[in-house]
Amino acid sequence: GNAAFVTITFNRIDSKIYVLDCINMTEPNPQKIRQTIEDLVLKYKPQEFRVEINAHQKAYSLDEDLRSWLSSYGVRLEAHFTGKNKWDTNFGVASMSTLFGTVRDGKFQGNNTIELPSTADSEGMKALVQQLITWKPNTRGKTDTVMALWFAVLRAREFMQQNSNMARYANNRWATRAQSSRKVSINLDEAFAEQWQENYG
């Protein structure tokens, strides 16, 4: 099989996910994979590197030398186990479809959360776009780049939730009595109007 690497960034200001790079490695071996990891870290200086640990890739999450090298550049290595959850329509790969925006009356609405770069000079990006177009649940075709994007999007969604104003108003069952006593009620109509004014006013 192939090994795929997708590099993204999440912009907290516009709440968009920007895909920076995609590498679709044919005939991967440990040396090529390690070199690609190092190249991506040096080029993009990420905060986190996610690795699927289902097959032989598990060795990377256990590789203390790699962990040490990554930490010397301030990069955390996170392991991701893929089970049947990848087919879950609310959480899995299919849930990314809404992030690419919607079409109404045959017209794109411009409401996408994911921005893809040009495919002109990148075979990896061409592969990602092609796999996104042809992806369907339980597919037997190549899905390496789509899966790599999904791992990255899972992390971006965590940032999106932290960035959401909803987190401020959500119930917290672990709140202390002091924190609970400082809770206040708000008028959602007024809060929405205020947020609308801040964002679009």
Residues covered by each model-derived region:
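Short alpha-helix plus adjacent loop in nuclease-associated cores
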Residues: S72-S118
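RNase H-like, metal-dependent nuclease domains and their acidic two-metal-ion catalytic environment used
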Residues: G1-A79, E115-G201
